[in-house]
From Swiss-Prot:
Keywords: Secreted, Signal. It comes from the Eukaryota. One of its GO terms (cellular component) is extracellular region. One of its GO terms (biological process) is sensory perception of sound. It holds the Pfam family OTOS. This is Otospiralin. The keyword Secreted applies.
Length: 89
């Protein structure tokens, strides 16, 4: 009885390994939209005052989030992962 169970277990392992089952890669959804550009209603000096305040508090993750929001309004915003609309000079 044990030999039969071991034989079926070995056969199952030998046949299961070469099957080569791989997970299907997930395709990107063509209907997804890029993230919306965040809104920064304050001035540049307000931004730097907030940076200095957060530095005194040691709140560096908040500085990164705020900087991402602030700099998304400039042409380099597309490098931050935001779609920046074309702006005429």
């Amino acid at each position: 009885m044990q030999a039969c169970v071991l034989w079926w277990l070995a056969l199952g392992m030998l046949l299961g390994i070469p099957a080569g089952a791989k997970p299907m890669p997930e395709e990107a959804d063509p209907h997804t939209q890029p993230p919306a550009m965040p809104y920064w209603p304050f001035s540049t000096s307000d931004f730097w005052n907030y940076v200095q305040y957060f530095q005194t508090q040691g709140a560096y993750p908040q500085i990164e989030d705020m900087a991402r929001t602030f700099f998304a309004h400039f042409p380099l915003g597309s490098t931050l992962g935001f779609h920046v609309p074309y702006q005429e000079d």
